[in-house]
């Protein structure tokens, strides 16, 4: 992994991940609605993070790195502040390498602090890191930016036909105007590579889980809004209407787009069931959102959880062993989220089977209180003959006089056609919740500031 300022980016990435935030390296910045059709890269963000907030929202954090010793600290602060404004970020860190004889002036640091930015010299970062992550700092975390690149860029280099999904989750996703476009577009680009995924390959499954983590970022935003609006509704019609309104920017907008889409499908002779702009496997999606509202703060830990899962699979390590004894509900929601993404993208069924077996065995280990004694499941390969795991049933959503929405199952059929799932969509100022337990690389709300 050879990039400019790689050492500083590694420091910030590890620090952000050790604090339980969802972190990314080198996020491109495009001018939304520009003359170049959103294809011209203006600059990039060295390290970009999303952290959970107590009120079920995502808060964006900008990390800027500079090894050029003659760089003006105030100029870098203003640069980072502009990126914060563009992405709706709440805070930032500027990490500079300075000439030992020319330390950063205190007024520069005070100026940065007023703009919501921590201005830190590279030699001092270890002190900052150990203080914010007392007492050991982030060096104990097993994650690295290089490992993340091996899942994303490394897999795509070996399998170029996966590039449509890779390009989206690396570049376009974080320049979308809102998280609801991300929700739709992450599935749409997954559909484009569905015939290229081999669930028997660890690198392919890890790549799918990483993509599912991007989807989960937007899902968390959606769950946060629905929870504040309805808490834990069991009425299908209410949840259905709320989600369609939220995802399309209002009921009028939904009706307008839905009407146009229905006419297009009808003109092409499409089936009646394809004339709806809802996500693929819509009933399963409704059930997924309802399940998340039972513990909405966990929704903002799922992207981080799926990142850890992907790294464990890629590295052939015991599955989620680094988390110790996580809450079974967190694991269950992670399994349901990844399973839905695989189903919605119409990926091979074996991918969902393998994901459910990995999570199911880990849930069973935690549930029986034998995490430290029972052998951990290897992420390299799980036998397909694994015994079924008994999990608490998902909440039932009632539709008045109608039957409840079907629960997530092993073989729920998908509606045909890619449909509107290929439409675009995601912003950097979504929604997140706090964790109730501190898990490595997942979330610790006491360290969110």
Q: Language-model segments: which ranges?
A:
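Domain-level recognition of nuclease-like catalytic cores that cleave nucleotide substrates
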Residues: 98-165
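Acidic-basic catalytic patches of nuclease active cores, encompassing PD-(D/E)XK
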Residues: 1-42, 53
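Glycine-rich, highly charged phosphate/nucleotide-binding loops
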Residues: 41-51, 73-78
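Catalytic cores of nucleic-acid endonucleases
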Residues: 60, 65-123, 285
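Long, charge-rich C-terminal accessory regions
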Residues: 164-330
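Active-site beta-strand-loop-beta-strand hairpin of nuclease catalytic cores
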Residues: 50-62, 256
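Acidic/glycine-enriched edge-of-secondary-structure segments
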Residues: 31-41, 57-72
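Charge-dense, extended regions
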Residues: 264-449
